[in-house]
Amino acid sequence: MRAWLLGLALASSGSAAMAADQAQTPAASDPVATATPTGLTFGAVFGATDLSGRQPRALRLSPDGTLLTSLRPRADDRDRLDLWAQDTRTGDERMLVDSKAIGSGAELSEAEKMQRERARIGGSRGIVAYDFAPDGRSILVPIDGDLYLATLDGKVRRLTDTPGGELNPVVSPRGGFVSFVRDQNLFVQPLDGGPVRAVTTEGGGTVHFGEAEFVAQEEMDRRTGYWWSPDERFVAVERFDEARVHVATRAAIGATGTKVYEQRYPAAGTPNAAVDLYIMKPDGTSRVKVDLGRNADIYLARVDWLPDGSGLLVQRQSRDQKRLDMLRVDPATGKSTILFTEKAGARSWLNLSDAYHALADGSLIWRSERDGFGHLYRFARGRWTQLTKGAWVVTGLVGVDEAKGKVFFTGNQTDVLEQHLYSVDIARASAPARLTERGWWNSATMDASTTRLIVSRSSPNQPTQVYLADAAGQRLSWINENAVAPGHPYQPYLADHQPTQFGTLKAADGSTLHWKMITPPLDPGRKYPVFFQHYGGPGTGQQVTRGWAGPLPQFLAQQGWIWFQIDNRGSYNRGKAFEDQIYHAMGSVEVEDQLAGANYLKSLAFVEPTKIATYGWSYGGYMSLKMLEKNPGVYAAAVAGAPVSDWKLYDTHYTERYLGDPAKDPQSYAGSAAVQDASAIRDPLLLIHGMADDNVFLDNSTAVAAKMQASATPFEMMFYPGQTHAVGGSGVAEHLWRTILGFLDRTVKERK
């Protein structure tokens, strides 16, 4: 359950400081201070134009670094994406593939719809992914269930034309093949125009080849189930069988009818899919089974080939997620040996990470939380060298320059509210060199030659900007300056843009909790209601950062609300001790820390203490329920969007990571559930859910509704036909927020 924040760009980013820092005030030269006031409206915030400006997605550099490609929303439809290309030498840009020109508009297969939900792109249309050929001369483009090959001169060749659709398409490492999954089997097609051939043929029913199982996609950030060797001699292929996985009957209730799906859903404590790994040639011959150990009840976490293709690295995670073994596999025999093992503490778990890199000399750059914080290590010839250390976190691995002996990574060494790009020596521990400017939330990717960086950044007053930089972090050119100047969609609203304030509180155990706040212009003596937004869950990025929070919080401030967020114990990027406090105790310290935030708000002279509304989605929706149940009278009203109400209903990998096996620790599940005490809720509640949600099933909300109805406990409810976990889309997002704010106006603002 990665964070779901409903609304427009309500992604954690921004802001806030009254207790510890001074509020940020726009400088005289800041356009915020000089623009003419024009108030935000529902139509502006939720209309076809993204007020945060043009936001390219899936930015990539071509293998030779001369071309920058991205997916961009159309001017008239921000949910439809086209493929664009920009010459990094001249800055010239052009649309490379027009999604409307080649798209058929065909309905996607149910398998592809579910994959898109797992990747959090379910609401996007047009071109949502692409893959460069290794020579950089062509690009594989999937659209509307079929595959196309685009060349740099704008010509497009159709590769497939089938009713079933293709999943997980890639160009092989040397450009010889396009590979994809169709009808639960792996296929390859020579790019020279030869016939498509099946690599596997046994897929069907409950058996899948080349795909990632549900929990791998949803909870492990693993999207594929096959991996080419660098020389194209072999392909490693996952096989999974869902025969023993519980069949959940899910009704997708739409506007004109209901479809019933028999979805294989591994709820906590129930069997997972049986997973095996094979290595074979691209024609399916010479198949060998990889030895994953005697215990079949494990997770296939990550699979990677060594740079020279001599072996396979496989990360095997135990079912309880307290042990992870790094296996080296012989591709000729499938035999595996353990290179090293990571183990969690007694009241902890292991977080998976993509921050690792195999080097040509046989060593490995590896992120571990073994010292209590996520740091980089080098594993060479059986010995470990710690490359970064301290009470801060490495958040991602960006690139490795083996020739110059440098590792590039993102982290929060400088400021826990800021993410920066750093470099450090490979050979020894040294002080990291920061390569990005203070005051921003940054992310970065790097080209294969480790000479160019794509850096994205934002701040509370500046929507996301993207620039091209050299390996020293020096900006070479803007990719998307996105300056809020005349012509920018947000420019008319700058004069009313309010500064974001940051501050800190102390939790009951002395932990520092960071908060952010946006207020309306404050009139002396007046008290204001609070829109208290929360997520609160583990395993995701923090919510309180110095990044752009989008126009919605500003809209709320213009509507007279104070917008407030606080990061509680149990959340990510603060070290394991901070995160581990929710172990076998969900809905405990998170609720306590949100209460500390509410009590702090009530101490402020400009806050109306009887008018604090709370809102959350997904884990945040669960938190809304728990906050009302545990703290009656504190919150004037709550909105619970797509909440998990009973953790026994949620999936294995996420839930068991934090609560364990429900058969072994039923008390943790009982104490963490929200449905049991729903009838105790006495404050106004609005329950919201998508009626086709395949992640947090609608059953979670109907269980709460039934419990409250049985006890004659009043509440309000809004369910969205055809909508999945991310409720939104044209018209729907505006309806959602009109519903939320209409409810809060009645129950909070107008409260006597």
Placement of each model-derived feature along the sequence:
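Serine-hydrolase catalytic core recognition
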Residues: 58, 223, 246-247, 301-304, ...
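Bacterial N-terminal signal peptides that target proteins for export
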Residues: 1-5
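Beta-propeller folds
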Residues: 7-13, 17-446, 451-464, 468-469
